[in-house]
Amino acid sequence: MDLGVKPATQRLYIGIDPGVTGAVAAIDQKGQVISLQDTPTITVKRGKVLRREYAEPAMAALLEGILQSAGAAYCPCGNPSRHLMQNVLVALENVHSMPKQGVASSFSFGVGFGVWRGIIATLGLPHERVEPGVWKRALKLTANKGTAVAKALRLFPRAELGHAFQGRMIYSDGRAEALLLAYYALQQANSKTPLKSKA
């Protein structure tokens, strides 16, 4: 499985957009993109309808792969697990139902959020659940996802935020928001201000 992971240095900040079209991003303390991957999903037939659902084992493997690669770089003693806890911070977007959002969509989003929380807890990672309005205001974004894509392109011009389709680029707001969540965590760490999260 290609995790798209590059060697990391020192601290690691991970941002997770928990939607089924979301993503996981990891950057180091210099803002270098270490990994940027879509949330692993599978296509399942429910009755006559094909649906995308979360691929939980692959989600866990993705996060573990990022940590293993980063841990090897962090730890010269050969025991990366000893040092991961003090070198990693995960920013998980805290989800809730939104106006005009369908029941099925809200349920799916909540499932993804719960799966990621379980994986993070199992790995014992330091993390914060961050309200969308909090991190977006801090980065001067609006509710329009296009502003997140534009901001991510400015901050991370080399990141793979989209793909070419019929002669034009289609950008992933899930990848953009995951990157910006990681960037928000980095900014808060640099300012020595705890992430503003909901308990």
Predicted segment positions?
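Phosphate- and other anionic-substrate recognition elements at nucleic-acid/protein interfaces
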Residues: 1-199
